[in-house]
Regions:
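Feature captures the catalytic ectodomains and active-site-proximal regions of enzymes
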Residues: 1-398
């Protein structure tokens, strides 16, 4: 038996007056996710434990079957794994966002969704100017990068920049033991970036500049039981972002590269779906993650989020279901990792909908895939790290 997990990052939302009280998920045309819901089982899952901050890190670790209250140390650890950096015992990894600060406020958490090519040059410049034997900077995708501090500490309080969009950022700078070091790095990065030709060109073309690094998400290396060890399934992970690929690596999944996967609304949806179907030739489990709905939620853009959800439905879920026609050896789970409501522009902890279908399944009362539609499902899972057990256990004996 083979298993596909399809994640629309941040698809969940709140009812909006401008959509006649519907959520963006309810307003979107999603016939393929509705098919899964109407021809399988579903319900709601609590992806964010009460003690954890809402985020894609915590939520996706839970969805891969791990209790984050026992295994989570910080998202940057997983991003380091994805980039091929195996942390030493004294290393602490930090997510390093390129952001836009303006008039003392967090104007944009992504520096206007700066391109990977532009960002790579900026991070290389920062590493040249600020890097030392114990402090190194590594480029990632778009605005998402990595800092590794050898001999550093993770005993400090940091905050994601997407949680403070439009707010005065001073009160949210790193706090705690040796946090002054981080604040100094962030301040020094401003001087390096201010002298950048890339930023001057971005400003001239009406784009937001990258004015600073923002450090957060710190953590140390860890060891997780792999999905193959737990379920006897060899698998892969498909995502544009290092966080998800790194969680997959920690779970023993092989990252599958897809050309044109950007981590934004212009991503190569079809390429991801086709790569997932092809991977089933040699793998038993494939985890497919699409970032686009989450980015639209952070932007507070209703039309963009509806479009991202519809693209996920048509080009990911629809392509997968079409490719599986005639097969009786594959089950499909569709869900989102958390909600990124338009009105909040950040992650929240409410339960998310899920639905799955596969050979021989007896359907329940769920008819449509949405936040409210999921209330008719047969499962309401209080801890999402049990969801994978529920899904896989429906088709094979665990």
């Amino acid at each position: 038996m083979k298993f596909l997990v399809l994640i629309g990052d941040g698809m969940g939302d709140y009812p909006l007056p401008g959509l006649d009280g519907k959520t963006t998920l309810e307003a979107a045309e999603t016939p393929h996710m509705d098919y899964v819901a109407a021809n399988g089982k579903g319900g709601t899952a609590q992806t964010i434990p009460e003690s954890m901050q809402p985020g894609s890190d915590v939520a996706n670790i839970e969805l891969m079957g791990y209790d984050t209250t026992r295994t989570f140390t910080g998202r940057a650890v997983f991003e380091a794994l994805s980039m091929g950096h195996h942390l030493g015992a004294d290393d602490v990894a930090f997510r390093a966002n390129l952001v836009t600060l303006e008039d003392g406020r967090m104007k944009d958490y992504s520096a206007g969704h700066i391109t990977t090519e532009e960002a790579s040059e900026l991070i290389a410049r920062i590493d040249e100017k600020l890097g030392t034997e114990t402090l190194r900077f590594y480029p990632g995708v778009s605005y998402r990068h990595l800092m590794v501090w050898s001999g550093g500490t993770d005993a400090m309080e940091t905050l994601p920049p997407h949680d403070i969009i439009g707010q005065v950022y001073g009160p949210y700078l790193p706090k705690g033991k040796r946090a002054g070091k981080l604040r100094s790095i962030m301040r020094d990065s401003e001087a390096v970036l201010a002298d950048s030709l890339i930023n001057r060109k971005r400003i001239a073309s009406g784009k937001l500049p990258a004015t600073s690094l923002w450090l957060w998400g710190q953590g140390r290396s860890l060891r997780m039981t792999t999905i193959e060890e737990k379920y006897g399934l060899k698998g892969g992970v498909i995502s544009a972002v290092d966080l998800i690929k790194g969680i997959g690596v920690a779970a023993g999944l092989k990252p599958i590269f897809v050309p044109g996967a950007t981590g934004y609304v212009d991503t190569n949806y079809l390429g991801k779906a086709e790569a997932a179907l092809k991977a089933l030739d040699t793998m038993d489990f494939v985890y497919v993650h699409v970032e686009a709905p989450d980015e639209a939620g952070h932007n507070g853009d209703v039309a963009m989020k509806i479009k991202a959800i519809e693209d996920f439905d048509a080009k990911i879920v629809g392509t997968v279901l079409g490719g599986l026609k005639g097969r009786t050896d594959t089950a499909v789970l569709v869900t989102c990792d958390h909600r990124t409501p338009i009105e909040k522009r950040t992650h929240t902890r409410e339960p998310v909908p899920f639905a799955y279908t596969g050979p021989g399944i007896v359907k329940d009362g769920m008819e449509v895939f949405s936040e409210r539609g999921a209330e008719s499902g047969s499962y309401h899972i209080l801890t999402a790290h049990h969801l994978l057990d529920t899904f896989i256990g429906e088709f094979i004996k665990l």
